[in-house]
Amino acid sequence: MEVLRFTAVKSLNSCVRPEFTAMSSVIVPISTVKVSGTRKSKKKALICAKATEILSSPATVTEPLKAEPAEAPVPLLRVSPSSLQCEPGYLLPNSPVLGTGGVTGYEYLTNILSSKVYDVAYETPLQKAPKLSERLGVNVWLKREDLQPVFSFKIRGAYNMMAKLPKEQLEKGVICSSAGNHAQGVALSAQRLGCDAVIVMPVTTPDIKWKSVKRLGATVVLVGDSYDEAQAYAKKRAESEGRTFIPPFDHPDVIVGQGTVGMEINRQLKDNIHAIFVPVGGGGLIAGIAAYLKRVAPDIKIIGVEPLDANALALSLHHGQRVMLDQVGGFADGVAVKVVGEETYRLCEELIDGVVLVGRDAICASIKDMFEEKRSILEPAGALALAGAEAYCKYYGLKGENVVAITSGANMNFDRLRLVTELADVGRQREAVLATFMPEDPGSFKKFAEMVGPMNITEFKYRYNSDKERALVLYSVGLHTILELEGMVERMESADLQTINLTDNDLVKDHLRHLMGGRTNVHNELLCRFTFPEKPGALMKFLDAFSPRWNISLFHYRAQGDTGANVLVGIQVPPDEVVEFEGRADSLGYEYAMESLNEAYQLIMH
């Protein structure tokens, strides 16, 4: 049970089970209608007939699933998460098609029915959320996968695949790469099956995560700065040692294990279900649930939920092919995946109804909702489906229906709770962040306070500026209704106090609200947001790239409680040196975004 640290290898050779190789997908254009309807009657009759035939006979399939060999891989289209914009709760619809080859629906259904995941996993409860149900006017049901032995659904897929391995393969051991829940699932499964497990994690993995894996008896190896480097090492070591690589989502046996969640929901809730909301990272959970339910209860909508900045499945369905995100947000780290799986995409393209996108604030609000409902704290990815369900119900005005949200995990990093607390009321629309201009005259502050009226000020920042005729006040107010905010803004404007709503501006919420010190005129300042890896030497690597070549005029570091930290940097770069600056920024390998044109920066800091 040692913890080893190595330099990452560069080889990308993989070692996966010979029974499964990835399969190609068929390109299907996305529909342009807002909400997809019920399945075509022909398809419904076909799959219902299949389901009747299968369910009436004993399930005996225990062999590992097999798939056809893959064709040569085609380079994936690289896209930005921000290239797909929609309102929270809007269903980005998918137009499902009949199967296109590969592992059949019959095989998935029979394997889910005969899965042995209950040797280690629990049949988790389906609990009603009374407070949320009353607030939304629908019956909200929570599928409590956060109550599994490793506090995540991932144990199902890992164990199902490992339990099907021949004895001689188990004796050689297993290996996986993961920075979170999949690692614990593989470690516990190996413990129960009596085999050796090596878990490869990035060196940036928080101590609490790798120590949890170590306690389960696995060997933890810390390699590389990113998941990709850890995965490359794991696959190379699997090949050299003859170990079986256990993928986190893109394998039929893993998908089958996750599909048992859908089987349980269908058994636990006898009333008609309008929709089941499923968090999506690589797609294993939603693919498994859809593979089962669309063959036994095809009228139930299966809806994926993704963060706005980690929307690989939504963009893949939009483009009709798997795509690779050029960068991915790390707040909901359990679903921070740049590319969905080949087999998971094939199933999603065939079966699911669409995807809903939600922002970070909404996820934080749902974490708070869950705490108030059940006194449980979900991780961001674990609250994702609940946020999507709430947004969908509000957008479409859904009333009186049954909706199910899968609370997929509770491995919350404690350090992240500070940020969740700050953003939860914003996500609930119970707090607004505003900026108001007022004259630098005696009595202006009192006039401002009178205009705020009875509203509760939760945050206030002001600094006198002798060089300006107007001061800028940045503040937050508590809300009961949106009408309160509209009324206050109208009062401000009628008193010639220009007021701007910055509630949806992440730059303000992450950085600028902590930097109020007055506006300044810094020549040639470029404002950038970088994501630093949480490891020693990250800052010096950054400074070596830019200093003393250019002057750093602003620096604000904000730990996020995960493997990366948000850093806001101002650097004075003459116009004729911008190309050189961008080249150096690209060479760092840190994700970054330019913020110089951000409205809030222009108002507050410049």
Swiss-Prot record:
Its cofactor is pyridoxal 5'-phosphate. The lineage of its organism: Eukaryota, Viridiplantae, Streptophyta, Embryophyta, Tracheophyta. This is Threonine dehydratase 1 biosynthetic, chloroplastic. The keyword DNA-binding does not apply. One of its GO terms (molecular function) is threonine deaminase activity. The keyword Amino-acid biosynthesis applies. It is found in: Plastid, Chloroplast. Keywords: Amino-acid biosynthesis, Branched-chain amino acid biosynthesis, Chloroplast, Isoleucine biosynthesis, Lyase, Plastid, Pyridoxal phosphate, Repeat, Transit peptide. Induction: Constitutively expressed. Not induced in response to methyl jasmonate (MeJA) or mechanical wounding. Its main location: plastid.
